[in-house]
């Protein structure tokens, strides 16, 4: 069934115009992005297949162009459109979330990073950079892969902190298992970051481990 054969009330574009963007399902949003179906399938059928490929819609932001192309009906053009839309949304989210946000407690910081880190399949080491008022001035993923002291080097973290004229930093990484209990390597990395920060004069306010909808603050738990 082609898009032209879908009833007016079911077409994503018409639904958006009549009821607003919030009324659209995730599949309908994807359908608007990829625009067309194939000879044998409607755009909504293909869009729904994309959504079903991922356990959580947030996982789409980490998919490669090749992964999208594994979906029947998706070629390089459609895959590129999806990735461009996701990247634009990510950039808008980062800028919006950083504007005049003050970190007063671990919860404030976790609200910024939980949507990005909670559902990843690999460990990501992420940093928030703060000014003297504890306002977020920048944030970035520094390392991807298993967290250990040989990979997460304080030099890389504090080089960026100095470049951004940071007064303090907060570090985060996710545990793909969903269990945020710190490992011995997590504690060793934290110890090295604290020591380096003390020498440079940039405080490590916290190192937070993100699990599935839960977290552990190493500072609150007294690990440093």
Swiss-Prot record:
Motif (JAMM motif): 173-186
UniProt entry tagged with the keyword Hydrolase: yes
Statement: the UniProt record of this protein carries the keyword Ribosomal protein: no
PROSITE patterns: MPN (PS50249), UPF0758 (PS01302)
Source superkingdom: Bacteria
List of residues binding Zn(2+): 173, 175, 186
SUPFAM superfamilies: JAB1/MPN domain, RuvA domain 2-like
Gene Ontology process terms (BP): proteolysis
Keywords annotated in UniProt: Hydrolase, Metal-binding, Metalloprotease, Protease, Zinc
Gene Ontology MF: a single term: metallopeptidase activity
Domain MPN: 102-224
CDD domains reported in the protein's UniProt record: MPN_DUF2466
Family to which the UniProt record says this protein belongs: Belongs to the UPF0758 family.
Protein name from the UniProt record: UPF0758 protein lwe1562
Species, as recorded: Listeria welshimeri serovar 6b (strain ATCC 35897 / DSM 20650 / CCUG 15529 / CIP 8149 / NCTC 11857 / SLCC 5334 / V8)
């Amino acid at each position: 069934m082609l898009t032209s054969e879908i009833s007016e009330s079911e077409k994503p574009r018409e639904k958006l115009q009549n009821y607003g963007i919030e009324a659209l399902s995730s599949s309908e949003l994807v359908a608007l992005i990829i625009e067309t179906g194939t000879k044998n399938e409607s755009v909504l059928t293909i869009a729904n297949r994309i959504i079903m490929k991922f356990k959580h819609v947030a996982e789409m932001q980490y998919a490669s162009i090749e992964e999208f192309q594994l979906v029947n009906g998706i070629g390089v053009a459609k895959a590129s459109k999806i990735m461009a839309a996701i990247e634009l949304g990510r950039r808008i989210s980062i800028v919006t979330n950083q504007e005049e946000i003050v970190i007063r407690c671990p919860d404030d910081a976790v609200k910024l990073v939980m949507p990005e880190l909670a559902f990843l399949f690999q460990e990501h080491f992420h940093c928030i950079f703060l000014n003297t008022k504890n306002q977020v001035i920048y944030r970035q993923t520094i390392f991807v892969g298993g967290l250990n002291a040989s990979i997460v080097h304080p030099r890389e973290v504090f080089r960026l902190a100095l470049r951004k004229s940071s007064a303090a930093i907060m570090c985060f990484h996710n545990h793909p298992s969903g269990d945020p209990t710190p490992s011995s390597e997590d504690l060793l990395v934290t110890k090295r970051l604290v020591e380096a920060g003390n020498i440079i004069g940039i405080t490590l306010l916290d190192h937070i481990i993100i699990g599935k909808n839960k977290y552990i603050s190493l500072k609150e738990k007294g690990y440093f």
